[in-house]
């Protein structure tokens, strides 16, 4: 693991890629926009030239980043471009970062709906469609802070649906999104999985909608370096 401080957590940092989570302030104010500036230089990440924030819609929609994008309504972004930070806002939903050693990155907002609809598979399918000879052994999946099973109660129609379609990941009325995503990743041939192990509900350093009913969000980020 890279640097870990009171205002950010670095999961991978080398000469090719940076992956981190920033929780020093409410990043929800940057939603749904491409920012032509480095919003994370104060944390020591100096290489970033642009920061791309999705207009997250709780879907499994994934798009390929283009600097001319006008509509950022999606829950996943894919890019090969250097020094462009792909950003995921969350406060219990799972932020997923996918990195392929050939120089491809993706940032995914995998909440309950996105996980049920397997947004990770949608992302990998798009990547492999554009890059048919990729070695799947060189994919790396990072699961950043999100709600853990013991704090994720579901009920009503959602619980009934989960028990029917995802029974292995439901214990009484608790849903284990992290276990579901790991299972989906392994089915896609992704074996390099790093879970930061942080529950956003338990750790008060992180915003949690379930705990506090807040509209504030921390951000998970990935970018390729020159």
Curated annotation (Swiss-Prot):
User: Which InterPro entries would you find in this protein's record?
Assistant: Cu_polyphenol_OxRdtase, Cu_polyphenol_OxRdtase_sf, Cytotoxic_necrot_fac-like_cat
Q: Which cofactor does it need?
A: Cu(2+); Zn(2+)
Annotated residues that bind Zn(2+) are located at 58, 93, 109
Q: Which UniProt keywords apply?
A: Copper, Hydrolase, Metal-binding, Oxidoreductase, Transferase, Zinc
Q: What is its EC number?
A: 2.4.2.1, 3.5.4.4, 2.4.2.28
Q: How does it assemble?
A: Homodimer.
- Descriptive protein name: Purine nucleoside phosphorylase Cj1217c
Q: Which organism is it from?
A: Campylobacter jejuni subsp. jejuni serotype O:2 (strain ATCC 700819 / NCTC 11168)
């Amino acid at each position: 693991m890279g640097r870990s401080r009171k205002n950010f957590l670095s999961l991978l940092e080398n000469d090719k890629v940076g992956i981190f989570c920033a929780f020093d302030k409410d990043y929800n104010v940057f939603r749904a926009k491409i920012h032509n500036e480095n919003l994370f230089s104060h944390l020591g990440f100096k290489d970033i030239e642009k920061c791309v924030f999705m207009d997250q819609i709780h879907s499994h929609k994934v798009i390929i980043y283009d600097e001319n994008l006008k509509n950022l309504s999606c829950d996943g972004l894919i890019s090969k471009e250097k020094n462009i930070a792909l950003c995921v806002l969350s406060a219990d939903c799972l932020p997923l970062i996918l990195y392929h050693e050939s120089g491809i990155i993706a940032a995914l907002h995998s909440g309950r709906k996105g996980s049920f609809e397997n947004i990770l598979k949608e992302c990998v399918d798009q990547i492999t469609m554009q890059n048919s000879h990729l070695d799947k052994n060189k994919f790396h999946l990072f699961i950043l802070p999100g709600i853990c099973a013991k704090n994720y109660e579901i009920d009503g129609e959602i619980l009934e649906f989960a028990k029917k379609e995802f029974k292995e990941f439901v214990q009484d009325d608790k849903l284990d999104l992290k276990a579901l995503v790991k299972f989906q990743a392994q089915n896609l041939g992704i074996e390099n999985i790093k879970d930061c192990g942080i529950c956003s509900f338990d750790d008060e350093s992180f915003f949690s909608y379930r705990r506090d009913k807040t509209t504030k969000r921390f951000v998970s980020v990935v970018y390729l370096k020159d």
